[in-house]
A protein has these predicted regions:
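An N-terminal domain-cap segment
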Residues: 1-50
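Structured surface interface patches that mediate subunit assembly and partner/cofactor docking
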Residues: 3, 17-21, 44-59, 74, ...
Length: 197
């Protein structure tokens, strides 16, 4: 089972354990909102485009409201089955969902008293490093200072380096921790256990 699939399975169990009204780290969202987001993102590509294209956001909002009106456990179980047979996302699950499932699993865990960071195998850390490397710059593009992401065991990732000073180490923010925690931080989660210097 891939890491992405394992995280999906664990999230389904946690969604059911906590019910639809539990908090998450996603500001303003309950577990019902997060489950609806995950279902729409994976099952309604026409609507999920609204996550990235502002003109399509009204469609996203309409479809999300429809999903929120469905039975919570049914939505969770349907999402838990993964992308349907003819859904193109089924074939890129590992690449597309490793970070998404990890971060949202932590959103649920940490908002509900399970605050300890999890230990992962070297293979999983490698799998989580790829999205950090690919998306770190876009997540931190608005930073006024260069940010150096220093995940343990990996080369530093320099982001938001508009003036070319990061290589010299001047006037930068350094974020240190395991790759999983640095990834959480890059996704904007204050609960990430990182050192910022």
């Amino acid at each position: 089972m891939s890491f992405s699939s394992a995280e999906r399975t664990k999230m389904v169990a946690l969604f059911h354990e906590l019910g639809p009204d539990a908090p998450t780290l996603c500001e303003g969202w309950t577990t019902r909102d997060l489950a609806a987001h995950l279902w729409v993102r994976e099952n309604r590509l026409d609507a999920s485009a609204g996550l990235f294209i502002p003109a399509l956001k009204p469609r996203l909002d309409t479809v999300t409201e429809e999903v929120l009106e469905r039975d919570y456990d049914e939505v969770v179980d349907d999402w838990g089955k993964g992308a349907h047979k003819f859904n193109p996302l089924r074939y890129v699950d590992k690449v597309l969902n490793s970070a998404e499932h990890f971060v949202h699993h932590e959103d649920i865990r940490r908002a509900n008293g399970r605050t300890e960071a999890r230990d992962f195998s070297a293979a999983t850390q490698n799998e989580l490093h790829l999205p950090l490397k690919m998306m770190g710059s876009s997540f931190l593009s608005k930073s006024t200072l260069p940010v150096v992401l220093e995940a343990e065991g990996f080369p530093p990732i320099v982001t938001a380096d508009k003036h070319g000073v990061a290589d010299k180490g001047d006037a930068v923010v350094r974020v240190r921790g395991t790759v999983s925690e640095v990834l959480l931080w890059a996704f904007g989660r204050d609960a990430a256990q990182v050192q910022i210097v």
